From Swiss-Prot:
Residues 116-138 are annotated as: Disordered. Residues 126-138 have a biased composition (Polar residues). It is found in: Cell inner membrane. Keywords: Cell inner membrane, Cell membrane, Membrane, Protein transport, Translocation, Transmembrane, Transmembrane helix, Transport. This is Sec-independent protein translocase protein TatB. Part of the twin-arginine translocation (Tat) system that transports large folded proteins containing a characteristic twin-arginine motif in their signal peptide across membranes. Together with TatC, TatB is part of a receptor directly interacting with Tat signal peptides. TatB may form an oligomeric binding site that transiently accommodates folded Tat precursor proteins before their translocation. The chain crosses the membrane at residues 1-21. It comes from Xylella fastidiosa (strain Temecula1 / ATCC 700964). GO terms for molecular function: protein transmembrane transporter activity. The gene is tatB. Belongs to the TatB family.
Amino acid sequence: MFDIGFSELLLIAVVALVVLGPERLPKAARFAGLLVRRARTQWESIKQELERELEAEALKRNLQNAQQVIHDAQAQLQSNQQDMDIQNSISILHEQTKRDIHPDHDTNTLEPSTAVHHVHVPPPSTSTHGNNGQEKSQ
């Protein structure tokens, strides 16, 4: 954590022994250990809180991204629905136009047996027409 080597730690111990003396050195070492332990605990606490905050921010971003995707999908779905409605309207208009231009053959056709009518045409009379279809003069 502090990147202190063995030789540096030994130097600090010798200076502490000279300054504090052999009677107060164990008490000072315990106090220093307590301070280091508290500092580490505080550091870990801050680190965990930061990680939770970062995780919460990541979740918030993911939620916003998911909401944006849902919003985009809803807009696309609505656009597709409008396209389908327009396509259905065009199809209906197309069918109506076809019926108007070409009347439905099912309602205007008759059965073949009833569709044929026998019409009697009288033969031409000989008194009014000549050989070549000209009128006779009297």
